[in-house]
């Protein structure tokens, strides 16, 4: 069995065994260097194929049954070989008389086919590659490139054309028609929030306990419990009104004189050296007024004569009353709510209790409140500053107590002048706002900051939009970038990331035929830095097609060789 291939003598012997004439293959005189080192001869490829075909036809006429066999060529580690496989088949023949003849025929056939395959491989290696095998003709059909690609494969128009004036027949890419990606969607509107403006009554004092009503500041009443001189005068006036009483003290009794038992004044006109009756006038508070003497016909008050015992009793009574007044002193107004001691003097009344002025203090800072307004929280007094620090709501912006109007928004309390737009710093005054990341924005700044911008006008999109080319568009702005016309059925062409209609896309891409002025789709001729339909790339004089041959350019126009020589030679 041959392993390196059959030479021509072996092939002749094989054909002689088969009853055929010798091969008529001629060996060329030129020796070519091939990849197979074992053979230095070059055979004509077509003659070898014709010879093999005749052998196959001869074998088909043989009466014995031949099975289909495919034998690969032996591997050569030095070169890359092409595996050629041939299949030979025949109709089933009648039952052979002897089994041994069939087996011998099969063995011979195996040797024959293996030798043929080896010879064919060797012959193919010896045949040099001609330039025509690498020429792609202009009329060859190449598959169209993928969509949105601007590059294409270039094929030479003819192997006989000159290098500098070859019209290149190329396949123009189909413009990418985008139909499914241009969809109209409606953007979800952001949530609109409402700021609540709160105003409290009175002094607008806020408490941390929302269930309780806002306390109002209370006023303090101060009184003085020390009795004045007017009060003492009134007391004495009520006890003893002034009454003038004339008391006559009788002289000592003289035995030689007559006693006078009349209760009236006696005027004795004796010698001054004699004893006289003394008259003493004394103003005494006796607690009652004199009654007129009914025996007096002239209705005049006659002085009352007080004996010595009555005068002593009266003096003792007055002395006792004065002592009682001195020992009693001022009366207590009550017990102080701070120190629990009696209150004498100035008193402060607040929260239903009495206080010493120095004991009525703020429960938090212990500063005396005096007659200032105070705030009551849990039955305890607080000054205004401490009450705001402890119980008033705090502004989310400045963290200061809110004692005036406040705005409730975003779950927090704000001063009216501190609840403003994060971007423009304008107050909302209880109006609508938009929230993003816990911060308020007005409508204009919210859309200008966070909304998607249109690919045509670069303005924020608030309503419906079109999704195309990886961005969003206002429906009225998604138009051809050249003629500003809307697209029919949503079909458009992309060039440079912008949408175009069919006509202006080819103008922008330079894919307009220079001959007819229409868009070039499919195969085209690239010549003179222009694109042409293959049927429109013709000689400017004789109008014969030039796509398959050479041309000569003159003044920017193509000419065939004959016309160019006639016109410009």
From Swiss-Prot:
> Molecular function terms in GO for this entry?
metal ion binding
Give an example GO biological process. Answer: cell migration
Cellular component GO terms, alphabetical: cell cortex; filamentous actin; filopodium; filopodium tip; focal adhesion; protein-containing complex
Low complexity bias spans: 79-102, 150-161, 207-217, 273-301
Chief subcellular location equals cytoplasm
Tell me the InterPro entries matching this sequence.
PDZ-LIM_domain (IPR050604), Znf_LIM (IPR001781)
Where, by residue number, is the motif LD motif 4?
Answer: 311-318
Keywords from UniProt, A to Z, are: Cell adhesion, Cell junction, Cell projection, Cytoplasm, Cytoskeleton, LIM domain, Metal-binding, Repeat, Zinc
Q: Where is the LIM zinc-binding domain?
A: 334-391, 393-452, 453-510, 511-569
Tissue expression pattern: Expressed in the upper and lower cup of the fruiting body.
The UniProt entry, under PANTHER family, shows: LEUPAXIN, PDZ AND LIM DOMAIN PROTEIN ZASP
Q: What is this protein called?
A: Paxillin-B
């Amino acid at each position: 069995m041959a392993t390196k291939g059959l030479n021509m003598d072996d092939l002749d012997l094989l054909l002689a065994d088969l009853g055929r004439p010798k091969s008529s293959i001629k060996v060329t005189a030129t020796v070519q260097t091939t990849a197979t080192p074992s053979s230095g001869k070059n055979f004509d490829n077509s003659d070898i194929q014709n010879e093999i075909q005749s052998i196959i036809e001869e074998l088909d006429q043989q009466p014995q049954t031949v099975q289909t066999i495919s034998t690969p060529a032996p591997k050569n580690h030095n070169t890359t070989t092409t595996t050629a496989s041939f299949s030979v088949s025949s109709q089933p023949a009648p039952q052979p008389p002897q089994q041994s003849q069939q087996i011998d025929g099969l063995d011979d056939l195996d040797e024959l086919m293996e030798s043929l395959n080896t010879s064919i491989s060797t012959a193919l290696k010896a045949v040099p590659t001609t330039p025509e095998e690498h020429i792609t003709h202009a009329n060859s059909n190449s598959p169209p490139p993928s969509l949105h690609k601007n590059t294409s494969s270039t094929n030479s128009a003819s192997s006989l054309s000159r290098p500098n004036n070859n019209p290149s027949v190329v396949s123009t890419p189909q413009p990418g028609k985008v139909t499914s990606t241009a969809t109209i969607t409606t953007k979800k509107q952001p949530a609109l929030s409402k700021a609540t403006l709160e105003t409290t009554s009175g002094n607008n004092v806020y408490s941390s306990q929302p269930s309780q009503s806002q306390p109002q500041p209370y006023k303090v009443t101060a009184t003085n419990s020390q009795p004045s001189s007017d009060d003492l005068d009134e007391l004495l006036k009520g006890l003893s009104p002034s009454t003038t009483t004339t008391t006559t003290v009788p002289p000592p009794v003289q035995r030689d004189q007559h006693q006078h038992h009349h209760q009236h004044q006696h005027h004795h006109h004796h010698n001054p050296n004699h004893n006289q009756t003394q008259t003493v006038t004394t103003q005494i508070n006796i607690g009652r007024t004199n009654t007129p003497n009914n025996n007096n016909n002239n209705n005049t008050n006659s002085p009352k004569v007080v004996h010595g015992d009555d005068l002593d009793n009266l003096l003792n009574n007055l002395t006792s009353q004065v002592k009682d007044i001195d020992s009693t002193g001022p009366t207590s107004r009550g017990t102080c709510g701070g120190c629990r001691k009696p209150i004498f003097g100035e008193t402060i009344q607040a929260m239903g209790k009495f206080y010493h002025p120095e004991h009525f203090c703020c429960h938090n800072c212990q500063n005396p409140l005096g007659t200032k307004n105070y705030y009551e929280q849990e039955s305890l007094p607080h000054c205004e500053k401490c009450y705001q620090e402890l119980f008033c709501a705090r502004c989310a912006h400045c963290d200061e107590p809110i004692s005036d109007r406040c705005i409730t928004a975003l779950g927090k309390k704000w001063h009216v002048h501190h609840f403003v737009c994060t971007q423009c710093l304008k107050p909302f005054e209880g109006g609508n706002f938009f929230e993003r990341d816990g911060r308020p924005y007005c409508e204009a700044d919210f859309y200008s900051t966070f909304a998607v911008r249109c690919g045509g006008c670069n303005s924020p999109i608030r309503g419906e939009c079109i999704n195309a080319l990886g961005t969003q568009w206002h429906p009225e702005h998604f138009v051809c970038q050249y003629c500003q016309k809307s697209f029919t059925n949503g079909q458009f062409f992309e060039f440079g990331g912008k949408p175009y209609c069919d006509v202006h896309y080819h103008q922008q891409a330079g894919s307009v035929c220079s001959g007819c002025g229409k868009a070039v789709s499919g195969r085209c001729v690239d010549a003179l830095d222009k694109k042409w339909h293959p049927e429109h790339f013709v000689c400017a004089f004789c109008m014969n097609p030039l796509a398959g041959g050479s041309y000569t350019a003159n003044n920017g126009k193509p000419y065939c060789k004959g016309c160019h020589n006639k016109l410009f030679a």
